[in-house]
Amino acid sequence: MPPPGKVPRKENLWLQCEWGSCSFVCSTMEKFFEHVTQHLQQHLHGSGEEEEEEEEDDPLEEEFSCLWQECGFCSLDSSADLIRHVYFHCYHTKLKQWGLQALQSQADLGPCILDFQSRNVIPDIPDHFLCLWEHCENSFDNPEWFYRHVEAHSLCCEYEAVGKDNPVVLCGWKGCTCTFKDRSKLREHLRSHTQEKVVACPTCGGMFANNTKFLDHIRRQTSLDQQHFQCSHCSKRFATERLLRDHMRNHVNHYKCPLCDMTCPLPSSLRNHMRFRHSEDRPFKCDCCDYSCKNLIDLQKHLDTHSEEPAYRCDFENCTFSARSLCSIKSHYRKVHEGDSEPRYKCHVCDKCFTRGNNLTVHLRKKHQFKWPSGHPRFRYKEHEDGYMRLQLVRYESVELTQQLLRQPQEGSGLGTSLNESSLQGIILETVPGEPGRKEEEEEGKGSEGTALSASQDNPSSVIHVVNQTNAQGQQEIVYYVLSEAPGEPPPAPEPPSGGIMEKLQGIAEEPEIQMV
């Protein structure tokens, strides 16, 4: 049996045609394309005189429909769109076969449980597959031939000496300056330019950039009783230790807004923040009035206000409730029909309960003089073991980000004390697994199993806990940066999740005058 994550690529594949009721099967892509091309020729050109007469009668109403099973694609533009689409079905069939082989090689994994009827729904594809390798620009309608063509560029690429380093291969894609130690790495890199996928789920049809991501797709559907790896920060569970490590990186902030103090874990989060908080651009405009907004969701909510009749009505028998917005009808379902009137939010200071998070936010700000974290527009709440949502008391900042903050001038920040390197030393708390610069795609076969409810890693990246303290009058805010390991000392051995590190940290935070964000 191959190692975990490896796909046994076979020469002979089981490629079954799904055009209409056709049951043709072959083992090579060349024969498969030759067969499907015959379907396309017959479908596009026809063979009877009656079809030709109908075509002459209604030349403007010609449609190019795909007859592949469970596919509703129809092109009104040209037959070329249909040809590219159907050829992608052929390529997709091969990827699903590789996905099936991958599952068969993993005895511990079951099948995908998502909708089988979506297995042949493929994404929108470009007008043509264009190679942008230097001095090439060949164009293809067939994705299989396109990806093989680009792969040939990587195999024919010559090694070049760059400075004092060993010879490398250069990516010749337009606008790319990447270099690689060998051709195999260049070949993998080119997939980021072509958006090539190498495996697909045989059940739901989802396509993936590598086999590891496909197997993760299956593992994420594991039943809850088999998800043995739990995040100590948000209590989510995962089937493997690596999935937990990937998830925990989302809790560590690596990026800071250049215009305010907001920090976040992902570049996409920073882009969204910049668009919503610092940009006045409102690209989504209402056709009925002068209203404009920054995202499609807000526009859809606004359009509901133009409807004379309520757009949503309750489906429950004998209930006449109606509403203009989706938010209102969902709130009605929760409160009236799902029994969601019990308070779910609890103040961690005085134990007062609330049914909505924004009511708890008002309570924390007015009753206990809590402040929003600098640069953040709201509080975050976390579900605890008793089922109540309480204020999230810990925020993780990477060491690199905190050092960047320390280098910035502290004038006008409102801090009661100045921050320097000496104030950060000597306090050992804990390490959080995960490297901020880790590649998004891992090598195949690196998925691993573990036996504990916490993640571990040979080289965990240092993390800083940011603790905001506010006095009883709410006059001053002091920020303490706590290093995860003391300078000059080896990192402490990781403790099990029940070892009390997080409990001690939160115990300190739950004092009335402490706010941990």
Swiss-Prot record:
Q: Which gene encodes it?
A: HINFP
Q: Where is this region: Required for activation of histone H4 transcription and contributes to DNA-binding?
A: 374-407
* Name of this chain's protein: Histone H4 transcription factor
Q: What does this protein do?
A: Transcriptional repressor that binds to the consensus sequence 5'-CGGACGTT-3' and to the RB1 promoter. Transcriptional activator that promotes histone H4 gene transcription at the G1/S phase transition in conjunction with NPAT. Also activates transcription of the ATM and PRKDC genes. Autoregulates its expression by associating with its own promoter.
Q: List the source organism.
A: Homo sapiens
Give one GO molecular function term.
chromatin binding
Q: Where is the composition biased (Polar residues)?
A: 451-460
Does the record's keyword annotation contain Transcription regulation?
yes
Expressing tissues: Ubiquitous. Highly expressed in brain, heart, skeletal muscle, spleen, kidney, small intestine, placenta and liver.
Question: Where found?
Answer: Nucleus
